[in-house]
Regions:
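Zn-dependent metallo-beta-lactamase
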Residues: 1-102, 207, 287
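Active-site metal-binding motif and surrounding structural segment of the metallo-beta-lactamase
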Residues: 94-151
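Active-site metal-binding loops of divalent metal-dependent hydrolases
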Residues: 25-27, 82-84, 133, 224-226, ...
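Structural motif
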Residues: 76-78, 127, 241-242, 301
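Cap/insert and terminal regions of metallo-dependent hydrolase folds
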Residues: 99-113, 238-323
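Metallo-beta-lactamase
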Residues: 8, 103-120, 124, 152-221, ...
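Active-site environment of divalent metal-dependent phosphoester hydrolases
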Residues: 133-139, 226-230, 250-254, 307-312
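Glycine/small-residue-rich hydrophobic helix-like segments
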Residues: 205-208, 212-262
């Protein structure tokens, strides 16, 4: 039994559970001053860009976005984020310069090579869902030739047209995703949220989506960092979940309230922030904090994409292992 009453949906009869296997899709070095306040001017952390293989055992009553295993007898393989590209030269010059500013960094071997080394052909990844479209999350999409790509509402427009935001991290490359195999989730603020298969509230989150329609995986709308930013809430066992938080926060101290979101002065004297909409980002972090207080103790583990201490504790569970 759960230690305390929880807001999470109870397990169904014959409830399917997913497995989640973390991977480090490269490493970059981040200066605290760009992410948290207050901060030491020289404080830096070399952090992973985490990606996660989420494996659904099947069968699939509802197969999202028409994506299905090439062999229906095998599980459904979903990648949440793909980390960094495997080589700096696979980025345009503007992003190569940005990565050089994140030294020391490590890009090799890339997620596709790690999957192969662990016994999974990247061609058997059925779906790639991106928390958002930044360079350190979209990885090498062309190495996943059979996957369907899913982004949050507005994500495809970000890739094709950018966001008009300043800062070297706000650089996007049209054509990064194969448009013929890419889809956006519906607008979480639109009408029809309460309809079957549409966005529904869960605890403090106004918009969540039961992705496989079986209570195993919930997409959580977490706006602020970039249009279409998503978290993924995965049911591992009856009373055990993990929420994959992408870039909702970059530092655990933002969750505890020990730090605030950082800003810095750009070359033109304007104020810059790692989040495109800092106020919405603050609200998403507040909701995460509230969510932690509403679920059963130890029932849900939260992990963001750049948590180096979490990775050091859990790298032994990395693919082909599982959490």
């Amino acid at each position: 039994m759960a230690p305390t009453p929880s807001i999470l949906p109870p397990a169904l009869p014959n409830q399917p559970y997913v497995t989640v296997s973390p991977m480090a899709g490269g490493f970059i070095t981040l200066s605290d001053k760009f992410f948290v306040h207050p901060s030491s001017p020289d404080a830096k952390r070399t952090v992973p860009s985490l990606a996660f293989l989420v494996t659904h055992p099947g069968p699939h009553n509802t197969t999202p976005h028409g994506a299905s295993p090439s062999n229906p007898s095998r599980p459904f393989n979903l990648m949440f984020d793909l980390g960094l590209r495997r080589a700096k030269e696979r980025y345009p010059e503007a992003l190569q310069r940005h990565i050089e500013g994140r030294a020391p960094y490590q890009l090799e071997p890339g997620i596709a090579a790690q999957l192969e080394a662990g016994g999974l052909d990247p061609g058997e990844v059925d779906l790639v869902m991106l928390s958002h479209c930044h360079y350190d999350h979209h990885g090498d999409p062309e190495l996943f030739a059979n996957a369907h790509f899913v982004v949050g509402h507005g994500g495809l427009d970000v890739l094709e047209h950018g966001v008009g935001g300043k800062g070297s991290h706000q650089h996007f490359v049209p054509g990064t995703l194969p448009l013929e195999r890419s889809s956006e989730l519906p607008d979480p603020s639109g009408a029809g949220r309460g309809e079957e298969g549409k966005w529904k509230p869960l605890g403090p989150f106004p918009a969540t989506l039961d992705y496989f329609s079986d209570g195993s995986v919930f997409v959580v709308d977490t706006p602020g960092h970039l249009p279409g930013h998503l978290n993924l809430l995965c049911r591992l066992a009856e009373h055990r979940w993990v929420m994959l938080c992408g870039d909702t926060y970059h530092d655990r101290r933002l969750l505890t309230g020990e730090r605030e979101i950082g800003t810095w002065e750009g070359a033109d004297g304007g104020t810059l922030c790692i989040h495109l909409d800092p106020e919405k980002a603050k609200e998403s972090i507040r909701r995460l904090r509230e969510f932690e207080g509403l679920v059963g103790q130890g029932e849900v583990e939260l992990v963001a994409a750049h948590e180096e201490e979490w990775w050091e504790r859990n790298r032994g569970k990395g693919f082909p292992g599982k959490l």
